[in-house]
Amino acid sequence: MIRRPPRSTHCISSAASDVYKRQITFHAGAHSMDRHFQEESAEKNMPVIMAMITVWYNAFFNCQSSAVVPYSHRLKELPFYLQQLSMESLGKSVTKENDQVSINTGEILWGTVGTNSQHSYFQLLHQGTQFVPVDFVAIAKTRSKSADHNEMHNHLLANCLSQSLALMKGNSESEEAQKKVTGNKPSNTLLIDELNPFNLGCLIALYEHKVFVQSILWNINAFDQWGVELGKIISKDIYKELTSTDNESNELDSSTKNLIKLIKRNMPHK
């Protein structure tokens, strides 16, 4: 008699195998960008070009923030990942030789899914006074066979391309000042043929190498985070104060002491 594994065990095994295959494919995509970064000339090297553009905007246009706007709900977490990658790596004010930097480094990176943002901060991008370069990320095709889904996807792509075009060209012909959009606002459009593990790995590695190149150009260490570590150390001391019944510490400033008093006053009594 042949003993078959329980159906649920087989499903778990198949799911684990599928996840492993996707992970391998994801790493293969990242490795392909590693090879591109290592072997391609600077003139055609995507991470180098993107880093050079960002450093140029930072130095000569006083650019202090940039946006990443994916036009795909499946990439909704991408801006948050890139926030940590960029700001934690490049938020430094001393060089590798421990000297104070003489130029601006790093930038505030932010963004959300495109269709959500069109009715919020895109007004500022088009007609505001801030200089904010934008990276659009779009997916060329969808795997869905649904006609309605494909129609919706085409509208999504149309919105993406129209926003980048409007940023570039504007609408300065309008006679009414409040309707004028000057244009000449920079953006990149990263068009991915299909969203799959390989292409996602390639996309993530692209930004990782871009950040590394920026750190080289600014001569800063992208691989430490002492500001974050300081916050962790201080939080331990604050926690002790919050949970202590002893007199308050003299090492804290008056503002923090008062905040702790207010919190303790509203804590449930043991």
Model-identified regions with their sequence ranges:
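Single conserved hydrophobic/aromatic residue that forms the stacking wall/gate
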Residues: 1-16, 20
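A SIS-like phosphosugar-recognition module
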Residues: 4, 21-270
